[in-house]
């Protein structure tokens, strides 16, 4: 496994891979890797000749400076995990390599609508940062496929739209959420949880299951369902942030013709803002 930190060296290897006709898969990450990331790697390995994992804590997508500062950085441990998984390349650039002139005045990629709705409304600028860095990685690495986790449901929808709108010839693969045995979705931010909070954390998944059962049963009193869910979360020790029930295919409000719903949940537990989602097939 080769660790690449500079753009010239990356471009050199990408040119060689293209000349050799290799099928390249990209797994973009911010590091602090867990089993969910490893599932992305496994999916990439099954679909391509060469797997490149990027590790870059992207300052452009953080809406709070304190969150950027304390985001876990575990490059050595991450590389050890990826080496065991027989990843071919790790691209781990410094911030100055990606943004040599700083963020002020940086050209950015914005995806209208999806960037500012739902999660984007509560985290201004976040998705603009995501689409910009992913676009830069696509331009640099020129992958045939790229793997993203379905845990970040809105992010995956945003990337798919960006790829379509910008005419990238890249297959976007969504990989299902990986959960702990108690249902908690794996996330780098779980590291912020204390031992006591970790015991409480699966409550978010349980509340989503309760919402799903109501939707499957035909209940469409969405505001009432959401209000009850928020109350349940607060009683469990969370601070409910945002719960939405949307059309899974458009992320717009549910209509009578919606075939699938997605429950999008975000809640604070101590210093950790946990997000999760669950899709439900609706009775027609």
From Swiss-Prot:
Classification via InterPro entries = Cyt_trans-like, Pantoate_ligase, Pantoate_ligase_C, Rossmann-like_a/b/a_fold
Name this protein carries in UniProt: Pantothenate synthetase
Tell me how this protein assembles: Homodimer.
Q: Name one GO cellular component term.
A: cytosol
Q: Which residues bind (R)-pantoate?
A: 61, 155
Decide whether keyword Chloroplast is in the record.
no
Q: Where does ATP bind?
A: 30-37, 149-152, 178, 186-189
